[in-house]
Amino acid sequence: VSDSLRHRLRALPDFPDRLPAFDPALAPKDPVELFLAWFENALAVGVPQPHAFSLATATAEAVVSSRMLILKNIEPAASGAAAGVDFGAWQFASTRGSRKGRELGINPRAAMNFYWAGLGRQVRVVGEVSLLSAEASALDWEQRPGADGRVNPDWQLYELHPAEVEFWQASADRHHIRHRYVL
């Protein structure tokens, strides 16, 4: 089975035949601006669920887990913040009692990873996570698709404050391009 699987996996294409160009020298100073440009491109070419990302968290013992979530919003950098001092606040939500909620309660560091296979692109966002207010969490719960008016006191809106945002563009020649913003 192992050799058969290995051959089948090796036969699969890694990336699409046509990949978008990316020149890091032309990237904006603000990673949110570049993310939004890549996100809009993913929407325009029909990438399914471009707002979905994998969230990796860890326990106090460094046991890592990840799961798929939906990006709720990106709040812009604090007004008056100098360039490169604040990469905005990337929002997502879950129940506090879930595994991710418990892990974030113990270890508030996390990583988001957006992957747009059809474009050969991914964006990794790493930083500290904080809880938003009960009011903001309740409003997010009420605005969910299919909301039925019931209250969920365990629902929590979180925001990740990036210390690092990395953009990765696949290249057919395997000289993949990375562009990192680090605070």
Positions of predicted regions on the chain:
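Tryptophan-centric aromatic hotspots in well-structured domains and transmembrane helices
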Residues: 37-38, 90-92, 116, 153-158, ...
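Short aromatic-glycine-enriched beta-strand elements
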Residues: 51, 90, 177
